[in-house]
Regions:
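A conserved mid-domain beta-alpha-beta active-site/ligand-binding segment of alpha/beta enzyme cores
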Residues: 197-231
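Catalytic alpha-helical scaffold of carbohydrate-active enzymes acting on polysaccharides/glycoconjugates
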Residues: 2-194, 219-244, 250-295
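Short, glycine/charged-rich beta-strand-loop motifs at protein surfaces that mediate ligand recognition
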Residues: 209-212, 249-253
Length: 295
């Protein structure tokens, strides 16, 4: 057994964190755009189907996201001038290049999300994992023109060496830890790496598939989360970061998408809100709160 050694315990009241132009809260929206294998089980609306090969029912349900759902989400984010930070399986670049092109036209950010959602980073030695991380970085850079700065592990899974390898490969932030409302530095062997606030609560997979919430309840959860963070962020030095994690095969469905539209309308009609991308938050932190490289 071991204790974690990646970060220090720093209580919120002991920190100082501000945002550009005195914003109370930074809001970033993360569409997860993923590629699945037809012969491997994954996220399912009908779990018994995962025993079938091919699992046409669940594969088709997920495939709705890249065929229809993502385009509906793009329209909604466009309407509110909200940039997306896409958590991107690298294989999307080969299978659905039109999504990459549309995101680039909008100025969206693309962060690494592994090569495919069929391969979480578990039970890998360092060389194997480095190869996967590097392949993800290189494929996304080739498709978008920029190396990805952020990382979200498939299924938010890591090995004990993942943060070290991410820093080695030039990544600036990682979203797997989900344990804070503010960014903070991680200890890595060389360089620097931030833990960026992500959410497994304001996230449509657990909300709909685990908790069984309706779309209107998800909207209310987004609004409630925002309201509390917005009020807390009014205190000088106590600004917050709010993540909204989306999957196009869930929130991209018509009966759910209108509630996302309403939630984003509510957020963007507030003053002192910075609606931005993960890379912009990471850049602001690095410039405003420089840390010594980890040893």
């Amino acid at each position: 057994m071991r204790d974690q050694t990646r970060f220090e315990y720093t209580p919120t009241p002991e920190r100082e964190f501000d945002l550009p132009n005195g914003a109370n809260v930074a809001v970033w929206v993360i569409p997860n755009v993923e590629h699945y294998k037809i012969d491997q089980p994954s996220t399912a609306i009908y779990p018994p189907g995962t025993e079938y090969t091919p699992d046409v029912l669940n594969y088709g349900w997920r495939d709705y996201g890249v065929r229809a759902g993502i385009w509906r989400l793009m329209d909604i984010l466009d309407a509110h001038e909200v940039p997306g930070t896409v958590a991107l399986n690298a294989e999307v670049c080969d299978h659905y290049p039109e999504i990459i092109d549309a995101g680039l036209e909008r100025g969206w950010e693309f962060m690494g999300h592994g090569t495919t959602n069929a391969q979480p980073h578990v039970d890998l030695d360092e060389a194997e994992e480095r190869e996967l991380i590097r392949a993800t970085r290189e494929r996304i850079e080739a498709a978008t023109g920029d190396p990805p700065r952020g990382w979200l592990g498939p299924e938010l899974a890591e090995t004990f060496q993942t943060p070290d390898l991410l820093a080695d490969e030039g990544f600036k932030y990682v979203c797997d830890w989900c344990n804070d409302d503010q960014p903070y530095p991680l200890h890595v062997r060389e360089g620097e790496l931030l833990s960026m606030p992500y959410s497994i609560e304001i996230n449509d997979i657990p909300m709909f598939l685990t908790y069984g919430l309706t779309a209107s309840q998800f909207e209310q959860a987004i609004v409630d989360q925002f309201d509390v963070l917005y009020e807390e962020g009014k205190e000088p030095g106590n600004a917050k970061v709010m993540a909204i994690a989306l999957h196009p095969f869930l929130t991209g469905l018509p009966f759910r998408s209108k509630y996302l539209d309403s939630a984003l309308s509510y957020i963007t009609n507030h003053d002192d809100v910075w609606v931005t991308t993960g890379a912009e938050i990471a850049s602001h932190y690095a410039e405003s709160y420089p840390t010594s490289p980890s040893v």
